[in-house]
Amino acid sequence: KLPVEHCIYGTHGWQIAEELEVEGATYIDKPTFGWSHWEEQKFDNEIELIGLCTDICVVSNALILKAVFPELKITVDASCCAGVTPQTHKSALETMKMCQIDIINE
């Protein structure tokens, strides 16, 4: 039922673009919208999320992370995200802001 099929393991566009790779960063492959194993991860002081779709996967995981780690700084780089439509992208960003998730590069 995905409105836009994306990030399907092993297909073109699944890997992190070389320009976005950060040395020492942790990359997590998740099988569905919201990943339920965040609590098993160790984070120093901040998490930055990017990806497709802002209004499905990004917002789901940002909210899960905020619930699991309420004091951890969680940032979403809006310039590295896209929604199904421009309006749903914007709505997802607003939802995350209301839940104390930092949005940069709008």
Region spans (language model):
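Active-site-adjacent betaalpha module
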Residues: L2-E106
